[in-house]
Regions:
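Conserved small/polar residues in nucleotide/adenosyl-binding loops
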Residues: 2, 7-15, 676-682
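Phosphate-binding P-loop
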Residues: 13-17, 374-376
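Phosphate-binding glycine-rich loops of NTP-binding sites
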Residues: 19-62, 341-358, 397, 401-402, ...
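Flexible phosphate/Mg2+-sensing switch loops adjacent to catalytic phosphate-binding sites
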Residues: 42-74, 359-377, 409-420, 451, ...
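Glycine-rich phosphate-binding loops of NTPases
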Residues: 51, 55-57, 62, 67-92, ...
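Acidic, Mg2+-coordinating catalytic modules of nucleic-acid enzymes
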Residues: 208, 476-494, 498-683
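Extended helical coiled-coil dimerization/tether regions that scaffold
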Residues: 221-384, 405, 409-411
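C-terminal lobe/lid and adjacent interdomain/linker elements of RecA-like ASCE P-loop ATPase modules
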Residues: 398-492, 499-513, 539, 560-578
């Protein structure tokens, strides 16, 4: 659970069993969550004031103002300098792990109580003041100095440091702040969404609680801009990685054993042969030096000795070759060096090999085992930030399918439970989301607030997709067979037919330029099935427009489709209108419903359907009630469609508009709609 960091509010990220995927729209907090995990686990010294939830600095500055007030009191009550004042506003991370009885030796230094035997064990990492009294004294002294400098000036002085507590800490954050670790009470695990409070009596532990327990590895996105994260956590080409792998796991000159003797003998023979060749090649040059009486008497004789290092053989562009065409012999095989291969494939190979390196370093494969004195950590966490930054769309799905299997491809891993691997990926790729079990998705939802700095919370979609009812099955099938960009959209439009799918993007581009610049997911739901996506839409909290047909039927005539009319007791057959919003069935009510009544109670979902429209027909103003989206479009553009030449539905609409009476016009249009709807269903 991550709390109060960057643009995040309270983030509850229950990890999936093997891999967890962070999804969400742009600027929803995915990268902030990944970076904060890196800060807490790996780069504690890299915290900045920007890593606090920005809206909390108002409250932190109030703490600074209180300190100024306290400093003017004659007798300071030190109880006012309490860590509890800071607790709600500083970044913190709660880590919960499940410990079996046979694993207690890994956690013997962080056991919460004497009677704890196994089960949940929690650690809170909190970035907080080291010593509040020191912070109080130094801050109030700095402010007092500024007051003394400016109090006699007749004009307002230039703003001097520190303006407020944030300004003070921007320069000296790590002088006064550190990451402390606390043991949590396992009996309070899962009691609501509010993190358990720590009392003033809770004392931080004075060691790294995760040393020997968790191994962390990272692949950053490397966006090409100045990246605050360490550069070595990105990807490099395969040649560079092979050199690093060789040095750690293979190098025969390190911690020599019997298997290295043949290699060392070959290196020695190569050194001798090279020495002889160099001595012969440089002999005339060295003789010239001797004729200068140098080295001379008492000076050392010059000789040449080489040292062949196998890893040097990997320090060139063609260290890694790809066979592009096989030959009858090895010499006839056509090869290209790594840099001439496709960039997407290069990056895929490099990223997969980096995962292999992470796994083998964790499992201490090869020489690294002899150079290490500590046990293998039982938990391996790999953080991969936006792999699509390196990979083309075609290989993104290959990566996500293979990544976890690669991390477990070791004799001590596979399906065994002794060591656990947790792969955490942040992504903005619908291709990657498509390949994942939706239960592994964690959706970052931007909170919609007015006059406040925006924050995000995280929705655990394992609850949304965990059930096996028909609604959930439909949502899974629909997203799998179409696309998953709903998880990354700023808003969604749910439509029913092909006409809407073709025309809506055109309408948006022509009439709504602001919408055109937003990331809107257009989802075509065949028939009136939009309501089946309601649980997902509600959980995502995404702004949604549903365009549906009113679909009027006569309940007294075997629910036969009829043209919408008032006073006939007709009802809608649309499940969206009946079960979602506005949750009404009567056509009489629906066609007269106020616009404000066509949205959900939280204002995030709005439904649009046909209603009464005044048109001029044969010089008379009449009110008509369209049956479909297409009909409504025609009635809004009568002159255009009346003269339009075409086939099929367009021809039928044109003929209907040229009828002599409105009654006959509506009859023919309705027949055309029914025929079109039937043909579309058959297709």
């Amino acid at each position: 659970d991550l709390r109060m960091s960057r643009g995040l509010g309270d983030v509850y990220k229950r990890q999936a069993d093997d891999r967890t995927i962070f999804v969400g729209a742009n600027n929803s907090g995915k990268t902030s969550a990944m970076d904060c995990l890196i800060l807490f686990f790996r780069d504690k010294k890299s915290f900045t004031t920007q890593d606090f939830t920005l809206s909390n600095w108002r409250e932190i500055n109030k703490i600074g103002n209180d300190y100024i007030v306290y400093s003017k009191e004659s007798d300071l009550d030190e109880n006012k300098l309490s860590i509890s004042a800071w607790q709600p506003f500083v970044p913190q991370l709660d880590v919960w792990i499940n410990v079996e009885e046979n694993e207690i030796h890994y956690v013997n230094r962080i056991i919460p109580t004497l009677d704890w035997a196994s089960g949940k064990l929690g650690i809170r990492l909190r970035f907080e003041p080291k010593d509040i009294k020191t912070l109080y004294t130094d801050y109030t002294t700095a402010k007092s100095t500024i007051e003394e400098l400016t109090k006699d000036r007749s004009k307002k002085a230039t703003k001097l440091w520190p303006i407020h507590l944030w300004d003070f800490l921007q320069k000296k954050l790590h002088t006064y702040f550190t990451v402390n670790a606390y043991i949590l009470d396992p009996s309070k695990f899962g009691q609501g969404d509010t993190p358990q409070l720590l009392s003033e009596d809770n004392i931080p532990i004075d060691f790294d609680p995760f040393q020997g327990l968790v191994k962390i590895d990272i692949i950053n996105a490397q966006r090409g801009f100045s990246d605050p994260n360490t550069p070595e956590t990105g990807i490099s080409n395969l040649s560079s990685q092979l050199r690093e792998y060789y040095s750690k796991h293979i190098n025969p000159t390190e911690t020599i054993d019997a298997t290295d003797l043949d290699a060392l003998e070959a290196i020695e023979e190569a050194n001798k042969a090279f020495d002889i060749r160099l001595e012969a090649g440089f002999s005339s040059s060295l003789d010239e030096l001797r004729n200068l009486n140098y080295p001379g008497f008492g000076n050392p004789e010059i000789s040449i000795s080489t040292k062949v290092s196998p890893v040097d053989g990997l320090k060139h562009d063609s260290a890694v070759l790809f066979n592009v065409q096989k030959g009858e012999t090895d010499e006839q095989c056509l090869r290209l060096s790594e840099k001439y291969n496709g960039l997407g494939y290069q990056n895929l190979i490099s990223m997969i090999f980096k995962l292999i390196r992470f796994r083998d370093e964790w499992m201490k494969v090869g020489k690294i085992a002899k150079n290490s004195t500590h046990e293998i950590e039982p938990l391996h966490i790999i953080l991969v930030e936006e792999p699509e930054a390196h990979l083309h769309a075609q290989v993104q799905q290959v990566f996500i399918r293979k990544a976890y299997d690669v991390l477990r491809n070791h004799a001590r891993l596979k399906e065994k439970k002794d060591f656990c691997t947790q792969l955490i990926i942040s992504t903005h790729s619908s291709h990657i989301a498509h390949e994942c079990d939706f239960k592994s998705l964690r959706y970052f939802k931007r909170n919609i607030t007015q006059n406040q700095i925006p924050t995000s919370t995280v929705i655990n979609l394992s609850k949304t997709f965990g059930a096996e009812d028909e609604t959930t099955k439909f949502a899974k099938r629909y997203l799998k067979t179409t696309h998953c960009d709903l998880f990354f959209a700023d808003a969604a439009i749910l439509i029913e037919g092909q006409a809407e799918r073709m025309l809506l993007p055109f309408f948006i581009n022509q009439e709504f330029p602001k919408l055109a610049s937003a990331y809107i997911s257009l989802l075509e739901i065949g028939g009136s099935h939009a309501h089946r996506l309601r649980p997902l839409i509600d959980d995502l909290g995404i702004i949604t427009l549903i365009i549906t047909d009113i679909d009027s039927v006569d309940p007294n005539a075997h629910r036969r489709s009829v043209r919408p009319e008032k006073g006939k007791n007709y009802v809608t057959n649309s499940s969206t209108l009946k079960q979602w919003t506005p949750a009404k069935e009567s056509i009489e009510e629906l066609v007269d419903l106020a616009s404000t009544k066509k949205q959900s109670s939280n204002g995030l979902v709005r439904v649009a359907y046909q209603y009464g429209t005044k048109i001029t027909f044969k010089n008379k103003v009449v009110t008509v009630y369209p049956y479909t989206f297409e009909e409504a479009l025609v009635f809004d553009n009568i002159d255009l469609f009346k003269s339009m030449k075409g086939d099929g539905l367009i021809k039928k609409y044109s003929e209907a508009l040229n009828e002599s009476t409105i009654k006959e016009c509506l009859r023919k249009m309705f027949e055309a709609c029914l025929l079109y709807t039937s043909d579309a269903a058959d297709e």
